[in-house]
A protein has these predicted regions:
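Sec-dependent N-terminal signal peptides
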Residues: 4-13
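Structured catalytic-domain cores with a bias toward divalent-metal coordination
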Residues: 17-487
C-alpha cells in the first residue's frame, strides 16, 4: 500500500507542479482541460473564465478597452503581482510582456494556452518575482472566433496585414492598446497552417533583429531566445526522466505478486501524464524567416523598441501537444523577462538613445548572404515520393540546414526635422495619433522652404489586395521649394 501511495503522490506532483494542467480548483479548469486536451474554449467561455479569475484573485484585472469590427469590444487581461494595474506606473521599472491571441479565428491554441498561463500565475503555480507584468488580448479577431475556422474579420480583412494601414477598427484599436501597454516583449500566438512536416510542435519567428537595433536586437537574438531554448530543452529532459522513472515504478509495482491485485484495483490512472502523448515531449524550437515589413505585428513592435516573438504551433500535431508547447514557451519567455528585467530596461534606454542619435533611417532591407548559421533541423526520413512527398514518422531524422536571418539596409533616408501633413488627410492624421506620433498644429499661415518628394515611377499589382493597390519599385525625386502652409 505504501508503494501505491508513493506512486499516486509522484503522479500528482508531476501533473500538479510543473505542467500547465494544475487542478488547484475545479472552478478554474478550462474547457481544454475538461475535455482532456481535445476542445478549445468558445469566446463566451474565454471571457467568463477571465471574469471569474479576476473576481477571485486580486492579481488579475479584466477590462474592456477598444471596439472591433464585430461590434464587440476588445478585452485586456492583466497580471500584476502586487495588484497594481496602472501600467504607466511600471513601464520604467518592470518588464511588460504583451500577448495577442486569435488574429485568425482558427488560432485557438494560444487562446487556451494563455488561459492556463494566467490561471497558473494567479494561483502562484509559476514562481516569479515582482519584476514582470503580463498583459494579454484574450481574443483579437472576435467575429472570426465566433464564426470558427474563418480567418478574416467580419469586414473581410486579414488582420495580419492590417497593422499599419489600419483599415479595420480592430487594427486601429490594437495600435491604441499597444501604445497604452508600451511592452518590452510582444508575443503573437499563431497556428501554422502549412503543408510542411517536421518533428517540431512549434516554430517561432521574431522581429527583424538588425532593424530592432544593436542593443535590443543582439539581446533578442543571442540571449533571450537562447535562454528560452535551453530552458525548454532542460524541462523536456526532466519530464522524460520523471516519466521513465514513474513508468518503471508502476511496472515494478504491478508485477509484484502480493500487491498486484491491490494495485490494479486501487490505482487506475487514465494516463501517466497529461502530456504523455509527446514521447518525449518535444519542446525543441526552430526559427523561421523574419518578416521585414511592419504590416505584421511582430515587426511593427520594432518601431517602438519592443522585441517581438511569434509562436507558430503546427496544425498537424495533436491539439493537446500544441497548446502545451505554446504554454511552455510563453511561460519560459515570461520567466526570462522576469529574471532579466533590469538588463532589458537598461538596453531599452540605450537603444532609444542610439535611435535618437541617428541621422539616417533605413526603410528597405534585404537578406545579408554573408551571414549564415548552420542549424540542426529535426524532420523525418522520406518514405515515398509521388505527387506528394510522404515522410515516415517512425524514422526521425536530423539534418543540418543553412539559416539566413540577418539583414542589411538597402535604402535609407536622411531623417528630417519633421513631416508636414495637410489637414485634408484626416485618416492619415487619425492613424498617426493612434500610434502616438507626436504632432504640432501650425498656428498661423506660413510660407516655408521644404524638401518635396515627387513620384517619378512605380509599379503596381493588377488588382487590389486588402482594399489597396500594392505599389512597388517606387522611385521618387526630391526638390527644394517654397510652400504656402495654412493654420
Amino acid at each position: 500500500m505504501k508503494k501505491i501511495l508513493f506512486l499516486s503522490l509522484v503522479l500528482s506532483l508531476i501533473v500538479g507542479c510543473d505542467t500547465p494542467f494544475y487542478f488547484g480548483s475545479k472552478d478554474f479548469q478550462t474547457p481544454f482541460e475538461r475535455s482532456e486536451g481535445t476542445k478549445s474554449a468558445t469566446y463566451d467561455e474565454v471571457i467568463d473564465f477571465y471574469k471569474r479569475l479576476s473576481s477571485e484573485f486580486s492579481t488579475i484585472s479584466l477590462r474592456t478597452v477598444e471596439q472591433t469590427d464585430s461590434g464587440v469590444p476588445l478585452h485586456l487581461v492583466i497580471y500584476s503581482p502586487d495588484a497594481e494595474f496602472n501600467l504607466n506606473k511600471y513601464q520604467e521599472e518592470r518588464t511588460i510582456v504583451f500577448i495577442n491571441n486569435a488574429t485568425y479565428g482558427n488560432d485557438t491554441d494560444g487562446v487556451d494556452a494563455t488561459m492556463l498561463l494566467f490561471r497558473n500565475l494567479a494561483q502562484n503555480e509559476i514562481k516569479l518575482s515582482e519584476n514582470v507584468i503580463v498583459v494579454a488580448i484574450p481574443v483579437y479577431n472576435i467575429g472570426a472566433l465566433q464564426g470558427k475556422n474563418y480567418r478574416k474579420t467580419i469586414t473581410n480583412y486579414d488582420l495580419n496585414l492590417d497593422v499599419i494601414k489600419n483599415d479595420t477598427q480592430n487594427a486601429l484599436s490594437f495600435a491604441k492598446i499597444f501604445q497604452m501597454v508600451h511592452p518590452d516583449v510582444f508575443i503573437d500566438n499563431y497556428t501554422h497552417y502549412t503543408a510542411a512536416d517536421y518533428q517540431y510542435v512549434l516554430t517561432y519567428t521574431t522581429s527583424q533583429t538588425d532593424k530592432l537595433g544593436n542593443y535590443l536586437g543582439t539581446y533578442l537574438r543571442e540571449q533571450l531566445l537562447t535562454k528560452v531554448s535551453d530552458s525548454l530543452l532542460k524541462r523536456q529532459e526532466d519530464f522524460q526522466k520523471i516519466a521513465d522513472s514513474l513508468l518503471k515504478r508502476q511496472k515494478d509495482l504491478l508485477n509484484g505478486k502480493n500487491e498486484q491485485k491491490i494495485a490494479q484495483k486501487s490505482f487506475k490512472p487514465k494516463r501517466i501524464l497529461m502530456n504523455d502523448t509527446i514521447t518525449p515531449p518535444f519542446w525543441r524550437i526552430f526559427p523561421e524567416e523574419t518578416p521585414h515589413s511592419p504590416a505584421q505585428a511582430i515587426d511593427y513592435a520594432t518601431l517602438y523598441d519592443c522585441m517581438g516573438i511569434r509562436i507558430n504551433t503546427h496544425v498537424k500535431k495533436p491539439y493537446r501537444q500544441r497548446v502545451e508547447a505554446n504554454y511552455e514557451m510563453m511561460k519560459t519567455i515570461v520567466e526570462v523577462a522576469d529574471r532579466d528585467y533590469a538588463y532589458i530596461k537598461q538596453l531599452k534606454i540605450k537603444q532609444k538613445e542610439s535611435n535618437e542619435a541617428q541621422k539616417n533611417y533605413a526603410f528597405s532591407w534585404a537578406i545579408d548572404s554573408t551571414q549564415c548559421v548552420n542549424l540542426p533541423f529535426y524532420t523525418y526520413e522520406i518514405d515515398t515520393i509521388t505527387e506528394v512527398v510522404h515522410l515516415n514518422h517512425q524514422k526521425p531524422l536530423v539534418q543540418e540546414v543553412a539559416f539566413y536571418n540577418r539583414y542589411k539596409p538597402t535604402k535609407s533616408i536622411t531623417i528630417p526635422q519633421s513631416y508636414i501633413v495637410p489637414k485634408v488627410f484626416q485618416k492619415v492624421i487619425d492613424r498617426l495619433k493612434a500610434n502616438n506620433v507626436q504632432m504640432t498644429m501650425i498656428d498661423k499661415d506660413t510660407l516655408m522652404s521644404v524638401v518635396r518628394y515627387k513620384i517619378e515611377s512605380f509599379k503596381t499589382l493588377s488588382s487590389p489586395v486588402e482594399g489597396h493597390y500594392w505599389h512597388y519599385d517606387t522611385h521618387v525625386i526630391a526638390d527644394t521649394t517654397r510652400v504656402q502652409l495654412y493654420k
